[in-house]
């Protein structure tokens, strides 16, 4: 069965959830019921688990941790390490390379400029970024080419996998958010409620603290 749609919302009648889920699954849709519905789909403006998990269906990081705690490449070609040359021997830089052919849900290409913008977006001092700790110690970020970006730290970083790892630190589209930086970020309702992403779903309707409706991402 190919999943065509997803509905996520707050639980109002838990006793009715199982038959409702079964019925949805039969026509290519699935419902996910949380104890409390998400309020925003931008994890850089919220540290809430419900918001991070909901947004992770749409926007994705360079890498994630699997159930065993191992690093797994996602939008990145592989996980940079000292052994493969992706992390410098002195632990002061890490170089990420995007997979070729990645597209945003609007059909435009994902590039290293989006990766750099994501970091600049969160690190803006007027932003109040909820995930700022993930970018701690970054001195500069250099775009090497369309698919490659190097993060330079201000001191050796034994664990350089804070930025762009996991649902708390996904890549956002520069073209969509470039006018939403700093103090302007919280006011960008359209972007924060319906981010353009690379994930399996696209938001079709979002009623904060009520329900989110998604459809499959054709790209």
Residues covered by each model-derived region:
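Bacterial N-terminal signal peptides that target proteins for export
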Residues: 1-7
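Bacterial N-terminal signal peptides
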Residues: 9-15
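Sec/Tat signal peptide C-region and signal peptidase I cleavage site
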Residues: 18-22
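Short, well-ordered beta-strand elements
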Residues: 27-37, 77, 92-97, 115-118, ...
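N-terminal lobe/hinge region of extracytoplasmic solute-binding protein
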Residues: 33-87, 120, 196
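Gly/Pro-rich hinge or "lid" segments in bacterial periplasmic/extracellular proteins
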Residues: 66-70, 166-219
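Aromatic- and charge-enriched surface segment that lines or borders ligand/interaction sites
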Residues: 78-128, 144, 150-152
